[in-house]
Design a protein with these regions (language model features):
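Catalytic-histidine neighborhood of serine endopeptidases
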Residues: 47-90, 95-100, 112-113, 118-123, ...
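Active-site-proximal beta-strands of protease catalytic cores
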Residues: 14-19, 51-56, 111-126, 152-154, ...
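Flexible, gly/ser-rich surface segments that form the specificity/activation loops bordering the active-site cleft
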Residues: 3, 7, 58-60, 83, ...
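C-terminal cap/linker of serine protease catalytic domains
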Residues: 1-8, 125, 176-240, 282, ...
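C-terminal, low-ordered peptide segments at domain boundaries
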Residues: 102, 114, 280-281, 288-289, ...
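PDZ domains, with a preference for the canonical peptide-binding region formed by the helix
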Residues: 271-309, 411-444
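N-terminal activation segment of mature serine protease catalytic domains
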Residues: 1-42, 51-55, 64, 88-90, ...
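Catalytic nucleophile loop of clan PA
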Residues: 44-45, 156-177, 259, 398-399, ...
Length: 490
C-alpha cells in the first residue's frame, strides 16, 4: 500500500537528519581521548513536544547532537538525549529549541503480516571512493519477509545514514530501521526494531534516577536460566502423563529472579504469562510474522518491573504450580559503557593499566579467544573482572613477561580482587618482607610480579612523565611518605 500524499507531507517535515559529534576514549589507554568523529543517521518526531526516535548506535557516543529538516531549510537544531536502550538499539532524543508541528503516528508491530508492503524512509549516505554524498529524504519500497531474533526482516536495503529512520506500513510507523546484512547472498536484507519495543520502554516517563548528564540508560530483564529441550514421550514418562509440552530447567543463575520463585532445576516450565512454551523453548501456538518466538524475544513484550505469571510442573512434588515474578532489569558486569554519559575508571600501577572488564574491551580485542568466550556466555557476563589493558615498555611486567595485555588480575597482595574497588582495598594492605613494603599483583593463571612499593612508585612517576598520564591517590600517598620527586630527571 502506497503512503497517502497527505501522510507524505507530514513525513517530509517529521523525519529528520541527525548529525552526531562523538567522542570516545582509547579503551587500552583510557587517559587518552580519541579524535572526535562525526556521524549521521535518521530520526523522526513522535509528538508535538520535540521527542525524536532513532537508534541507540546513532547517538550513544555523541557529545553534541543536531538535527536538520531539509524540507524546512538548512538550519540545525540542538538536541539532548533522553534515554538509550542498548539492548533494543533504541534512543529517544529531544529538541532543545524547536518543537515540530508535524509528527508521525505509531502503529502496532504485533499485528504485522509476512508479505505486507513497507517503506524504508531515511537520509542515506552514498559511499564513494573519495567522499560521502549526503542524499535527500529517500523512500524505498520493500516487503516484510519474516523476523529474526525479534527484529522485522525486510527485503529493503538499509544504507548508512538510514539507521534510526521509520519503517512504514499502512501509513503508520511499525519499526525503526536498524541494520543491513551484506554479502554475496545477503544483499537487500534489512532489519528494523519493532515499534512496540519502544512502547514498553516507559521508564523515562516516571523515573527520577538520571545520571549527571541527565541521560537514562535503560537495561532490560532476563530470566537468567538454562534449560533442556524435551520430547512429549519423555515428559509423559517423567510426569506420569500429566505434562506433554514444556522445557526442563537445568540451571538457575544466582542473579536470576527465578531464584526465589520456587522453580528449581528439574522442574518443567510450560507457560509464561499465558504463552504456552513448546518442547524446544519456543512459543507453542503464538506466532509473530509466521514463526514461533523464543523466550528471550517473548520477554521483549513486557515492561521493566512488570509482574508476570509462570506455570510449571514441580517434579519433586509431582504437581502443577504457578508463581509470579517481577521482571527486574539485569545489572550485567560486562556491558557496554558510554564515556559521554558515564565515568570510566582506570588505575595505573607497576607500569600497567587496570580496568573493570567491559564489552568495549571485547569489541576492541575481537581476536582474543578468552574475551570472545565471555561475549558468548551470559553467565560469564554477570561476573566482574579486572583486566590489564596495557603494559608500558620497560616496566617490570613487560621485562619479566609475567603479566601481559588482556590478562585478568585475580589477586593483589594475596587478596582476591575482581574489580577496581577490590584493588583499592587490597592496596591498603601491602606485604611486609624484611621490614619493607611490597606490592604483589597476580593473574588468574598464577603469574605475578613482586616489587617494593617505593620502586613501584618511582617507576610509575617516570612512566607518568613519559606518557603524560596523571598519578593517582596511591602514588600521591607514597610520594609523600618517601619524599619522592614527581619530576623526571632522566
Amino acid at each position: 500500500m502506497k503512503i497517502k500524499e497527505s501522510i507524505k507531507k507530514i513525513i517530509n517535515s517529521s523525519v529528520v537528519r541527525i548529525i552526531a559529534e562523538s567522542i570516545d576514549i582509547n579503551w587500552n589507554l583510557p587517559y587518552l581521548i580519541d579524535e572526535p568523529s562525526k556521524g549521521q543517521g535518521t530520526g523522526f518526531f513522535i509528538d508535538k513536544h520535540g521527542h525524536i526516535l532513532t537508534c541507540s548506535h546513532v547517538v550513544d557516543g555523541a557529545k553534541n547532537i543536531y538535527i536538520e529538516i531539509p524540507s524546512l531549510g538548512n538550519e540545525k537544531y540542538n538536541c539532548k538525549i533522553i534515554f538509550i536502550c542498548p539492548e533494543f538499539d533504541i534512543a529517544l532524543i529531544k529538541t532543545v529549541d524547536y518543537h515540530s508541528r508535524y509528527y508521525v503516528e505509531l502503529g502496532d508491530s504485533d499485528k504485522l503480516e509476512v508479505g505486507k508492503e513497507v517503506q524504508v524512509i531515511g537520509y542515506p549516505v552514498s559511499l564513494t571512493k573519495n567522499k560521502n554524498i549526503i542524499n535527500n529524504l529517500k523512500y524505498t519500497v520493500g516487503i516484510i519477509s519474516g523476523q529474526q531474533n525479534g527484529k522485522i526482516q525486510t527485503d529493503s536495503a538499509i544504507n548508512p545514514g538510514n539507521s534510526g529512520g521509520p519503517l512504514f506500513c499502512n501509513n503508520k510507523v511499525i519499526g525503526i530501521n536498524s541494520m543491513k546484512l551484506v554479502g554475496d547472498s545477503l544483499d537487500n536484507i534489512g532489519f528494523a526494531i519493532p515499534i512496540n519495543y519502544f512502547k514498553v520502554l516507559d521508564d523515562w516517563k516516571n523515573t527520577k534516577i538520571l545520571n549527571s548528564k541527565n541521560t537514562l540508560i535503560i537495561e532490560r530483564p532476563d530470566l537468567l536460566f538454562e534449560y533442556n529441550n524435551t520430547t512429549t514421550d519423555l515428559l509423559i514418562d517423567i510426569t506420569k502423563n500429566k505434562i506433554k509440552e514444556g522445557i526442563i530447567v537445568s540451571d538457575i543463575y544466582n542473579e536470576s529472579v527465578l531464584k526465589k520463585s520456587g522453580i528449581k532445576p528439574g522442574d518443567i516450565i510450560t507457560d509464561i504469562d499465558g504463552y504456552q512454551i513448546s518442547n524446544n523453548g519456543l512459543t507453542r501456538s503464538y506466532k509473530w510474522l509466521g514463526t514461533q518466538i523464543s523466550i528471550n524475544v517473548l520477554l521483549n513484550k513486557f515492561k521493566n518491573n512488570e509482574s508476570i505469571k509462570i506455570k510449571y510442573f514441580d517434579i519433586k512434588k509431582n504437581k502443577y504450580m504457578s508463581t509470579n515474578i517481577k521482571l527486574e532489569p539485569v545489572d550485567f558486569k560486562v556491558k557496554l559503557y558510554f564515556p559521554v554519559f558515564e565515568k570510566v575508571d582506570y588505575f595505573i600501577i607497576s607500569g600497567m593499566i587496570l580496568m573493570n572488564l567491559s564489552y568495549n574491551h571485547i569489541i576492541l580485542n575481537k581476536k582474543n579467544i578468552e574475551l570472545f568466550s565471555i561475549s558468548q556466555n551470559i553467565k560469564e557476563q554477570l561476573k566482574s573482572r579486572l583486566i590489564v589493558t596495557f603494559v608500558f615498555p620497560n616496566s617490570s611486567a613487560n621485562i619479566l613477561n609475567n603479566i601481559k595485555q588482556n590478562n585478568f588480575i585475580e589477586k593483589v597482595n594475596n587478596i582476591k580482587v575482581n574489580d577496581l574497588n577490590g584493588l583499592h582495598r587490597a592496596l591498603k594492605r601491602p606485604l611486609i618482607i624484611n621490614k619493607k613494603e611490597f606490592i604483589k599483583i597476580e593473574t588468574n593463571k598464577g603469574k605475578f610480579i613482586l616489587n617494593p612499593i617505593k620502586k613501584c612508585v618511582e617507576d610509575d612517576i617516570n612512566y607518568a612523565n613519559t606518557y603524560k598520564y596523571p598519578l593517582n591517590e596511591f602514588h600521591n600517598k607514597y610520594i609523600k611518605k618517601y619524599g619522592l620527586s614527581i619530576i623526571n630527571n632522566k
